[in-house]
UniProtKB/Swiss-Prot annotation:
A biological-process GO annotation: lignan biosynthetic process
Residues annotated as binding NADP(+): 11-17, 36, 44, 148
UniProt protein name: Isoflavone reductase
Record-stated family: Belongs to the NmrA-type oxidoreductase family. Isoflavone reductase subfamily.
This protein's pathway: Phytoalexin biosynthesis; pterocarpan phytoalexin biosynthesis
Alphabetized UniProt keyword annotations: NADP, Oxidoreductase
UniProt lineage: Eukaryota, Viridiplantae, Streptophyta, Embryophyta, Tracheophyta
Length: 318
């Protein structure tokens, strides 16, 4: 169904931004993308490259062919940013972790433009107001939380999107460092493997984001994506994979104490990924009760969405 809600995506060619663009187009929203004159990042982590093989140039051509309105600009260029924002109703920022704090510039531009009905700051992970993460991830979460406070203090209408674990980072390799596919012989499990995590495909994040953007009931609330068939422990995920390949994997369980040591002695991106895995698989940062006054559970709000289950997602690797 077509909608008049004009949506601008910042970070539209990134790992999650591209899925938000396609979901917006599919939903019938007039869709805009702020695009910088830059080439692809040749230093993309292997997981990111495996999940998103399409180049930036290919992506932009496909956007144009699909009706996306490309606006040349940059978060750090106030004039082009304001001009872009003035053309839309909703701004969704999917900028990477290095640009989190730069969103104060987006907020400033939104305030100047004066027409934005909703802003989605770049989160797309766990709820940054509910976590027990360690460094180096903790700093990023704290930066995201500080952006929330600026949004609220400035009176900018918002929605926070908490999607937890992308399948492209957590499921396609069963959270194995330096692997891009699920293991077939041995698997390392952080903690006891009995803590539930919330998995979701990047495409489904796009779908739920746009549903929330078009839903007045999510105004000034956080939307949580914890889908019943994807709300699983590491042991449950591994059992799904073992059933598919007809083989029992050799399992090594790593204590929290050892994981914390490994985080401290590893370099980026290993330490960052380990800290993310620690947050979900050991600390259980996807397990919490929501407050209906300020939170929305995506599955309950949009039960008609046909999401990809963890079981279905793993079929491609058999």
């Amino acid at each position: 169904m077509a909608t008049e809600n004009k949506i601008l995506i910042l970070g539209a060619t990134g790992a999650i931004g591209r899925h938000i663009v396609w979901a917006s187009i599919k939903a019938g929203n007039p869709t805009y993308a702020l695009v910088r004159k830059t080439s692809d990042n040749v230093n993309k982590p292997k997981l990111t490259e495996a999940a998103n093989p399409e180049t930036k140039e290919e992506l932009l051509k496909n956007y144009q062919a699909s009706g996306v309105i490309l606006l040349e600009g940059d978060i750090n260029d106030h004039e082009t940013l304001v001009n872009a924002i003035k053309q839309v109703d909703t701004v969704i920022c999917a900028a990477g972790r290095l640009l989190i704090e730069d969103q104060v510039k987006v907020i400033k531009a939104i305030k100047e433009a004066g027409n934005v009905k909703r802003f989605f700051p770049s989160e797309f992970g766990l709820d940054v107001d509910r976590h027990d993460a360690v460094e180096p991830v903790r700093q990023v979460f704290e930066e995201k939380a500080s952006i929330r406070r600026v949004v609220e203090s400035e009176g900018v209408p918002y929605t926070y999107l908490c999607c937890h674990a992308f399948t492209g980072y957590f499921l396609r390799n069963l959270a194995q460092i330096d692997a891009t596919d699920p293991p077939r012989d041995k698997v390392v499990i952080l903690g006891d493997g009995n803590v539930r995590g919330a998995y979701v495909t990047e495409a489904d994040v796009g779908t739920y984001t746009i549903r929330a953007a078009n839903d007045p009931n999510t105004l000034n609330k956080a939307v949580h994506i914890r889908l019943p068939n994807n709300y699983l422990t590491a042991n449950e995920v591994i059992a799904l994979w073992e059933k598919k390949i007809g083989k029992t994997l050799e399992k090594t369980y790593v204590s929290e104490e050892q994981v914390l040591k490994d985080i401290q002695t590893s370099s980026f991106p290993h330490n960052y990924l380990l800290a993310l895995y620690h947050s979900q698989q050991i600390k259980g940062d996807a397990v919490y009760e929501i407050d209906p006054a300020k939170d929305v559970e995506a599955y309950d709000a949009y039960p008609d969405v046909k999401y990809t289950t963890a079981d279905e997602y793993l079929n491609q690797f058999v």
